[in-house]
């Protein structure tokens, strides 16, 4: 009887630990709370911290001065996904779509790259995926839920 109780106790503790771990993973990776923008993200070997911040600041100021059209679309599940459209110089016939990565937003990750494409004569569409930046949502879909 004592051995059976020990085995049941170990199984119960293991099950509780597994559920606790799964819940932590779900809430830390899938569920997204709205956050204020923090620091910029650029490849670590690209430039040092001061140069990175200066590049990000200059590029964002340049984009702000240039102006953009705020765009939005409603997803199949009713969320509003937001972005910015920048018109290139002259009459460009190509548009570059820049989609940020995990736990980022359109301006933080792609301000300098958007400037590069605009100066090269392309239209640029910067978007915020669901649960990122200005777009609605609490669950990160890694693009799967945004494809429709």
Question: What kind of region is each of these model predictions?
Answer:
Residues 108-110, 135-138:
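Conserved catalytic-core motifs of eukaryotic protein kinase domains, centered on the activation segment
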């Amino acid at each position: 009887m004592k051995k059976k109780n020990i085995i049941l106790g170990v199984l119960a503790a293991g099950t509780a630990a597994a559920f606790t771990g799964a819940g932590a993973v779900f809430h830390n990776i899938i569920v997204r709370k709205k956050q204020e923008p923090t620091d910029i993200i650029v490849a670590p070997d690209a430039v040092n911290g001061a140069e990175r911040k200066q590049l990000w600041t200059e590029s964002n100021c340049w984009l702000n001065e240039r102006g953009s059209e705020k765009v939005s679309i409603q997803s199949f599940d009713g969320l509003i996904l937001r972005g910015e459209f920048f018109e290139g110089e002259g009459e460009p016939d190509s548009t570059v779509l820049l989609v940020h990565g995990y736990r980022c937003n359109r301006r933080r990750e792609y301000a300098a790259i958007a400037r590069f494409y605009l100066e090269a004569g392309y239209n640029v569409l910067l978007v915020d995926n669901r649960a990122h930046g200005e777009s609605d949502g609490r669950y990160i879909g890694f693009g799967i839920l945004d494809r429709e």
